[in-house]
Amino acid sequence: VKSCVKCPTCAIMNGFGGAGAFSDGKYNLTNEFGGTLYEYIGKQKAMELMHYVDDINVACGGAGTKLYSTADSGFKRLCLQNNLHLLDASVRHLGTDINYKVLENLYAKLKDHVDFHFLTPVKALSITEDGAYEAETDKGVFTGHKCIISVGRSGSKWMESVCQSLDIPTKSNRVDIGVRVELPAEVFAPITDELYESKIVYKTEKYQD
């Protein structure tokens, strides 16, 4: 598609899979970066859930894809020798085509057991007197004793308003600012072939920042 086809909503950012449907299918299995789930449920439980999701991805079409890992990597020792710290992580790289197929297979497995309502804006979310959640939409009101909200970046402002209405405290996440430097693939091939993607930290000797 060379230009916008004027679809009712942007299918690249919304819908089943959201923005992730057309990503390169990279899944980081680590507590070192990418989120702070471990702060709420503990590091061990967080890792168990990440591996659980990884198992589902593999079972739904990701079999045969490579799981890269920093464990026992010679680059970790090389980093330490140069005052650098290689963050521990495993990375499952599905690739765009397989990632889309995994999501397609997931939808096929779920559609007979779950009611999907697309293009259904949630106007308000409240808690009833008996502790149930009530979601008001333009297609009616849905209630349930458990509610999972996963709106991504496109719904972050709406999510903030929901938290305010339910008196849920919020805080801003840290934003890492960096410089993107592109080099020929041959330069980084020894690293990317083994780790695919690595996070390397350098702390200044004087201020440790």
Regions found by a protein language model. Name each.
Residues Y52-I56:
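A general alpha-helix detector
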Residues V1-T36, Y68-D209:
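Residues forming the flavin
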Residues N14, E39, V58:
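N-terminal entrance/gating region of PLP-dependent enzymes' catalytic architecture
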Residues G34-H51:
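Short, surface-exposed, low-complexity cationic segments
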